[in-house]
Amino acid sequence: MFLYCINIYKNNILLESKKNLSRYGFFQKNTISEFMDFFSTTLLIKSTDNIFNIVEKEYKVTICKDIEYSYSIITDTEYPDRIIYNLHNELNKNHSELEIIFNKYSDAEIDKIGTINKELKETKEILNKTIESLLQRGETLDKLIEQTEDLTKSSKLFYKNAKKMNSCCVII
């Protein structure tokens, strides 16, 4: 989950931009930054929908148009759509705090639902393993009970046979 870029436009003119290009080398950063701006602006101009996504390999570009402002948000494909829409709503409310909003949404901890889902999956896996081990223990307990019953039957049979043998012999 990685947020690369947020661009804010007014009348299709770039007003403000915030990028995180830390995953790229020094000599690539300028070219990638220019490409992000160009690609976002082109999509914004050509789009007719108010909100749409374009996914290309490991990148997702989301264009959000409102009455006065438009936003371009570039993330990786793992970035959840619901977080992007929350980001869009927060930008609508106060786009002047782009730096703070960008830093807030760059943090993977912003996705509380995703974190809870991840913890639930881990808990589910642990519970499944525990239930499997309990079932295996139950199977071994069933085997032990069967063996105990067999041993009980064998001891009763042995006792009866020993009693018969002792009854035919007389002690002098």
Describe the role of every protein-language-model region.
Residues I116, L127-T130, L134-L141, T148-L151, ...:
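Alpha-helical heptad-repeat coiled-coil segments that mediate oligomerization/polymerization in large
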